[in-house]
């Protein structure tokens, strides 16, 4: 179980606990449950890398305590 911190740069930080074999799509659903926005409207990225929904957190080497950027489409 890892904890990922997502910052939307509008003053909101979301902390989500998930497994490292979860996909980015699963992470979006967990974030959507906490923020109240739809999962389809969420984009997760780090610098200029936009993460795709079907790839796991382990494949992207996302580890415990890592900070990601949260954008709303």
Swiss-Prot record:
This is Ubiquitin-like protein 5. Keywords: Cytoplasm, Ubl conjugation pathway. It is found in: Cytoplasm. GO terms for biological process: protein modification process; RNA splicing. InterPro entries: Hub1/Ubl5, Ubiquitin-like_dom, Ubiquitin-like_domsf. It comes from the Eukaryota. The keyword rRNA-binding does not apply. GO terms for cellular component: cytosol; nucleus. Disulfide bonds: none annotated.
